[in-house]
Amino acid sequence: MSDLLNAAALDQLFRTARTQNAFLDTPVSEDLLRELYDLVKWGPTAANGSPARFVFVTTAEGKEKLKPALSEGNAAKTLAAPVTAIIGFDEDFHEKLPYLFPHADAKSWFDGPRTARTESAFRNSSLQGAYLILAARALGLDAGPMSGFDNAKVDAAFFAGTPIKSNFLVNLGYGDPAGLFPRLPRLSFDEAARIA
């Protein structure tokens, strides 16, 4: 049994964490991004498939490649963020299953048309993207996840000639409280859950 996290840790991860729309002009080091990934990789995925592929866009050149794919409402904040993580998924993730899941022939479960693997790759990369948000918060970073972009343009700019497709984007850095909207409500347990 794991130890219970204290209230301050739960606040940092969930209760007081906010989706950031503006970031301070403070760089995020490559070492910190590597530390971030080294936490994310331990999150569970089906058959340990780990289909997510991450591109951490930090340079002016990278942001210029990303800019044409961004929706109008997301462009300014994304270009200003120190890091934009592209959460992608590898439709040929099963090729690594002999290494990642050696105690069964898991690769054979996903052999066949690539489209048959897309659902699992998308679902599990979404999990891994959520782990990235929580890991970022645990490391003192703030996150701003987004879906407002043109997937085909991102794929052409960053994943051309590969079996990788984009899922969603997450801006990362140190949030500027001035850019926050008022805290929005959440559904109560009785509105969103039930016990069967």
Swiss-Prot record:
Query: Which PANTHER family does this chain map to?
Result: MALONIC SEMIALDEHYDE REDUCTASE RUTE-RELATED (PTHR43543:SF1)
Query: What keywords were assigned to this record?
Result: Flavoprotein, FMN, NAD, NADP, Oxidoreductase
* Entry's Gene Ontology molecular function annotations: oxidoreductase activity
* SUPFAM superfamilies according to UniProt: FMN-dependent nitroreductase-like (SSF55469)
Flavoprotein in keyword set: yes
| HAMAP family in the cross-refs | Oxidoreductase_RutE_HadB (MF_01204)
What's its EC?
A: 1.-.-.-
Protein name (record): Putative NADH dehydrogenase/NAD(P)H nitroreductase XCC3605
Q: Which CDD domains match?
A: RutE-like
List the signal peptide residues. none
InterPro entries, A to Z: Nitroreductase, Nitroreductase-like, Nitroreductase_HadB/RutE, RutE-like
Q: To which protein family does this belong?
A: Belongs to the nitroreductase family. HadB/RutE subfamily.
Q: What Pfam families does the database record attribute to this sequence? A: Nitroreductase
Query: Is NAD found in the keyword set?
Result: yes
Which co-factors does it depend on?
FMN
